Amino acid sequence: MTRTVIGFVAFALATEHVRSSDPSPTPTPDKSQYTIFNPTPIDLRRPYNTDRPSKTDSPYTIDAGVFQVESDVWNWTLDYQNGVRTRTWIASNTNFKLGLTNWMDLQVFPQFYVNTRTSGPAYGTPVEHDGFGDTTLRLKINLLANDGGKLAIGFLSSLKIPTNTGNTGNHVWEPGFELPVSYSLPWGFTLFAQTRIDILDKPRSSKMRVQWQNPIGLSRTIVGNLSGYVEFYDAVSTGPWVGTLDTGLIYQVTPNFSIDVNAFFGLTDNAPDYNVFSGFGYRF
């Protein structure tokens, strides 16, 4: 999968080089002077974009001085393995984003409520936990084509902080970093992908483990303001690999507000069986 992502980037860079030889390209306004203290004027803002709802993040950052909220209203996951059924319910899984410069934004991503219930014939008495979830800090920079171009590349670093209560998570700080990319295809399609490394807690051990994620997908406008996407996600670590098929619909209510509904399906035994959720994004 990683070879696929790298090959995709190499091909897109070559194509973009040919495209850039156009003798009369549309000039891009210089926005390098704008910061959180000198916000980007509204008429110079780039098109609205979010890091939701697919597992692949956007390579674009929000404009300097802009505040944006992206949130799951509800998120329900079911996993059944070896006679044990685990149900997870998350409410208000919210990403607060602030544009720092024309090419960098800061994100604070708390889980306001998490409820897990474990049961099944191989488990015994059902156990339920609920409370505040973890908080993730993220810093994203755009490396290419933040304000135009077929190929866009970003870089995102993150740190999960164990703020959970009520035994809804582990108590380990978990860093990660990723390289998200997108490429505009003919007929209105967009190809998106990323490669990501996380340093995660290893269950029932004092050691950490490395997880490598490589989602890839396609998105397109369906009709009017309604668009959809399909994504294949895989993650490899010290245990069995995880694969899911992800899909969803996004409706652009206004130029600064979108809503979405999504369903992810496990393709491997080690993946959650079902994950359905709905949410929104809003740019102030």
What name fits each language-model region?
Residues M1-T2, S20:
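Extreme N-termini of proteins with methionine-enriched Sec-type signal peptides or N-terminal signal-anchor
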Residues R3-A12:
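Bacterial N-terminal signal peptides
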Residues L13-R19:
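C-terminal segment of classical bacterial N-terminal signal peptides
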Residues S21-F284:
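Transmembrane beta-barrel domains of Gram-negative outer membranes and organellar outer membranes
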